[in-house]
């Protein structure tokens, strides 16, 4: 029997009901939106009804330019064309909790996303964007709580009630220790900060999705399909366990969590992995925590392109015409011209293909540092200092640190200053080699 290239598990020519053993097949597969939710988190549409009429599916464009001003121009353009979902990517210094004027941020400001150092930057980033009419996804982990609070503060300035703000923070910080390395604090206080964020959102931002478990990043770091499906729920259970221990009910937590897995080939292995993840999650949340709400047992799941399969040169997808035979012959002729059936990385076009790269102006870094200098000049240093002291005191205790963190950000504290203050209490993390 052949074995799957991603999972290394036996793959038969046909997997029917007779292969399901140990449990009744109906119990293991169930109907869509029914526990254990192996098939889908939503019920199927009625026959004949268009998808948009039943459940609109906005597709946010992953976007973040060097400065808040440049990124805002892009968001304004997207919203003017009907977009109702935005996806913000931050630069590496912001993801690591550094200010744009920090020595370790040199050469990285605005390179991989938008630089956000303070509430003032967040105001510019979402200036003119009606936050009650868009859903915003923020791809950030270690400092996610800070950026979420800034977003809430901008919403308050717009007069938008907190219960009208919707979006997602991809707050799977444990992934950083395993796959990416963009962590700030040691694992234990990082878990606490996630739990504090979950508890805060359930009372202050009730429509916010708090954590998306990033199996896709584990896959990009080398995890097999089975490892990806095992590690992501393991992270999720750690967050739920910490939040429940802090006093949050599991049915107030689990419905606002989701999975993000890699989309690989063959699709059959990925579909099997997705179904397995849903079954495992339902059993774990109900078995260990006593979850009862249907949404707690039917997790939402999304996929992303598995980046490891991408190459510098990929053949374009060709539309098949009615005369498919002619199209196939043309493709075969082209393949022969390229030297036969070779790998994607082996084929090279004649000459250089035109490719427009996004070049970040080096002046972005200087302008961002200048903005921070102006901020420090006009803000109240006494108010900022008192707020940071209060946040340190809360971090050293057992209270929810987000309330004190929000006060510090509202006073004008920067991302770097807030992270530095927490590092004074919690320390930093330098992982040991394997």
Predicted regions: what is each one?
Residues 1-121, 125-132, 155-160, 348-404, ...:
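Acidic/polar, glycine-rich intrinsically disordered N-terminal extensions of enzymes
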Residues 46-63, 85-101, 111-112, 121-144, ...:
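Core alpha/beta catalytic barrel or barrel-like domain that forms the active/cofactor pocket
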Residues 65-80, 142-153, 187-193, 230-231:
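Glycine-rich anion/phosphate-binding loops
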Residues 80, 84, 127-131, 156-161, ...:
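Generic secondary-structure signature for well-ordered alpha-helical cores
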Residues 104-106, 153-158, 185-188, 230-231, ...:
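A glycine- and small-aliphatic-rich helix-loop capping segment at beta-alpha/alpha-beta transitions
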Residues 228-232, 269, 273:
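Short, contiguous, pocket-lining structural segments
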Residues 270-278, 316:
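Extended amphipathic alpha-helical segments enriched in small hydrophobics
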Residues 311-347:
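Long, amphipathic alpha-helical stalk/connector segments used for oligomerization, subunit docking
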């Amino acid at each position: 029997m052949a074995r799957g290239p991603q999972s290394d598990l036996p793959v038969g020519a046909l997997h029917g009901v007779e292969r399901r053993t140990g449990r009744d097949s109906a119990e293991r597969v169930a109907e869509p939106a029914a526990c254990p939710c192996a098939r889908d988190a939503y019920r199927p549409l009625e026959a004949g009804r268009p998808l948009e009429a039943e459940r609109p599916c906005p597709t946010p464009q992953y976007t973040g330019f060097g400065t808040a001003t440049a990124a805002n121009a892009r968001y304004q353009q997207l919203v003017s064309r009907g977009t109702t979902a935005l996806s913000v990517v931050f630069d590496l210094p912001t993801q690591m909790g550094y200010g744009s004027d920090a020595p370790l941020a040199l050469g990285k400001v605005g390179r991989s996303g938008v630089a956000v150092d303070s509430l003032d930057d967040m105001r510019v980033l979402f200036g003119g964007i009606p936050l009650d009419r868009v859903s915003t996804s923020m791809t950030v982990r270690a400092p996610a709580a800070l950026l979420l609070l800034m977003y809430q503060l901008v919403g308050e300035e717009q007069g938008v009630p907190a219960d009208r703000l919707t979006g997602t923070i991809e707050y799977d910080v444990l992934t950083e220790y395993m796959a990416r390395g963009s962590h700030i604090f040691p694992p234990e206080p990082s878990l606490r900060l996630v739990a504090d964020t979950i508890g805060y959102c359930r009372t202050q931002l009730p429509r916010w999705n708090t954590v998306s478990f990033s199996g896709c990043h584990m896959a990009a770091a080398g995890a097999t399909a089975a490892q990806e499906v095992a590690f992501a729920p393991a992270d999720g259970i750690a967050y739920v366990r910490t939040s429940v221990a802090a006093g949050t009910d599991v049915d107030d937590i689990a419905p606002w969590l989701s999975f993000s897995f890699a989309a690989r080939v063959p699709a059959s292995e990925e579909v099997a992995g997705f179904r397995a993840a849903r079954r495992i999650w339902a059993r774990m949340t109900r078995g260990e925590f006593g979850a009862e709400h249907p949404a707690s047992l039917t997790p939402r799941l999304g996929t992303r392109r598995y980046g490891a399969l991408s190459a510098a040169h990929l053949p374009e997808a060709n539309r098949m015409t009615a005369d498919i035979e002619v199209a196939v012959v043309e493709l075969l002729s082209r393949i022969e011209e390229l030297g036969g059936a070779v790998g994607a990385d082996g084929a090279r076009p004649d000459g250089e293909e035109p490719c427009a790269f996004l070049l970040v102006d080096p002046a972005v870094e200087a302008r961002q540092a200048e903005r921070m200098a102006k901020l420090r000049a006009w803000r109240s240093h006494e108010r900022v200092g008192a707020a940071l002291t209060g946040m340190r005191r809360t971090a050293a205790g057992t209270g929810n640190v987000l309330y004190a963190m929000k006060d510090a950000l509202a006073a004008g504290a920067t991302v770097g200053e807030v992270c530095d203050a927490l590092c004074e209490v919690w320390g930093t993390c330098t992982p040991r080699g394997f």
